[in-house]
Structures are given as structure tokens and as C-alpha cells.
């Protein structure tokens, strides 16, 4: 009986963690941001030359710095 209760609580904890993570960082928003940035012709040259290891939502930034607006979820190269 104790093992069944422990198993059920573990499952609920994992499900809760998954739901919280999905609410904060939904995959749809990530893809929308990525597509929006990739389609941004104005900043395309700036994003194509990056310092090693510096990326903004999988898009490289020239000066190695990236800013992400938490309110809108949009990311931009500084």
C-alpha cells in the first residue's frame, strides 16, 4: 500500500512539474520566436556573425550579447 501511494505521488509530482514547465516555456512560443527572428531581414547580417558560444534562441549574435524580453518572449541581439 505504501509503495502504491509513493508511486502515485511521484507520478503526480512529475506531471505537475511538466505542466508548470510547459506553461512557462511552451514549444509553440519558442518556434514562433525562432521563425520571427529568422525572418527578420533587417538584423540578418548582425545575427550571422557570432562570437563562439553566444546565442539568442539558437540564433547567433555578432557582439555575443542577447536580450530576451520576458513580457513578450521576443529575443533580440544587442
UniProtKB/Swiss-Prot annotation:
GO terms for cellular component: extracellular region. Residues 24-47 form a propeptide. It comes from the Eukaryota. Keywords: Disulfide bond, Ion channel impairing toxin, Knottin, Secreted, Signal, Toxin. Disulfide bonds join 49-62, 56-66, 61-77. Putative ion channel inhibitor. Belongs to the hainantoxin family. 20 subfamily. The presence of a 'disulfide through disulfide knot' structurally defines this protein as a knottin. This is Hainantoxin-XX. It comes from Cyriopagopus hainanus.
